[in-house]
A protein has these predicted regions:
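P-loop/Walker A NTP-binding module and the surrounding RecA-like catalytic core of P-loop NTPases
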Residues: 1-174
Length: 174
């Protein structure tokens, strides 16, 4: 597995991803802070192919869906990945904070329009947030929830279990 540090703007983003690479045994590809995220993605595809990695995860900077230049940058990263690998990505996931609320729908819709999402990763389900907005996202945008984050450890990123999610969202009366 390889990780691409395409979040070249947030302070300590590369270091944070380096920690995850170390924890998981993944190979990390990155460049200097402020580098072009598309260039990092291109280098990462080449490095992953050279190493025989079967999975490449490209971490991009968080961004507001209302900032058009940042959304265009994200679309560019996707185009670079497709061109460098010769095919579309297997997955394009939006990582959505479970505390986001109704704004999450607009965010998902605009990200989906810009880069063609394949699903969602819902994080921070270990707190009090329920993540109910994903029901609307799933219903109206036809985007499945693929992963959920329930903590800070490697094993806390889990496959989505609809029954477990529904039980947490609407618990049985006691």
């Amino acid at each position: 597995m390889s990780l691409a540090a395409s979040d070249t703007f947030r302070a300590a983003a590369g270091e944070q991803l380096e920690t995850w690479a170390s924890r998981t045994g993944a190979h990390l590809v990155g460049q200097a802070r402020g580098a072009d995220p598309g260039a990092v993605a291109f280098d990462a595809v080449q490095a992953a192919q050279a190493r025989g990695s079967d999975v490449l995860i490209v971490d991009t900077a968080g961004r507001l869906h209302t900032r058009e230049p940042l959304m265009q940058e994200l679309a560019k990263v996707r185009r670079v990945l497709e061109k460098a690998s010769g095919r579309p990505p297997d997955e394009v996931l939006l990582v959505l904070d479970a505390t986001t609320g109704q704004n999450g729908f607009a965010q998902a819709r605009l990200f989906h329009e810009a880069i063609g999402l394949s699903g969602l990763c819902l994080t921070k389900l270990d707190g009090t947030a329920k993540g109910g907005i994903v029901l609307r996202i799933h219903r109206e945008l036809k985007l499945p929830i693929k992963l959920v984050g329930v903590g800070e450890r490697v094993d806390d990123l889990q496959g989505f279990d609809a029954e477990k999610f529904a039980a947490a969202l609407v618990p049985e009366p006691e």
